[in-house]
Amino acid sequence: GIPICGETCFFGKCNTPKCTCNKPLCYKN
């Protein structure tokens, strides 16, 4: 739930491990 992945996502995938996509950012926990 914390946007600390430093990554944006638009297609439902995040490159950062253990990060999930919640447009427009990738979140971890």
From Swiss-Prot:
Gene Ontology terms: biological process: defense response
UniProt keyword list: Disulfide bond, Plant defense
Tree of life domain: Eukaryota
Cross-link Cyclopeptide (Gly-Asn) residue location(s): G1-N29
Signal peptide per UniProt: none
Family annotation (SUPFAM superfamilies): Cyclotides (SSF57038)
PTM entry text: This is a cyclic peptide.
Disulphide linkage map: C5-C19, C9-C21, C14-C26
Record note on domains: The presence of a 'disulfide through disulfide knot' structurally defines this protein as a knottin.
Family membership noted in the UniProt record: Belongs to the cyclotide family.
Function in brief: Probably participates in a plant defense mechanism.
Stated name of the protein: Cyclotide mden-H
UniProt organism field: Melicytus dentatus (Tree violet)
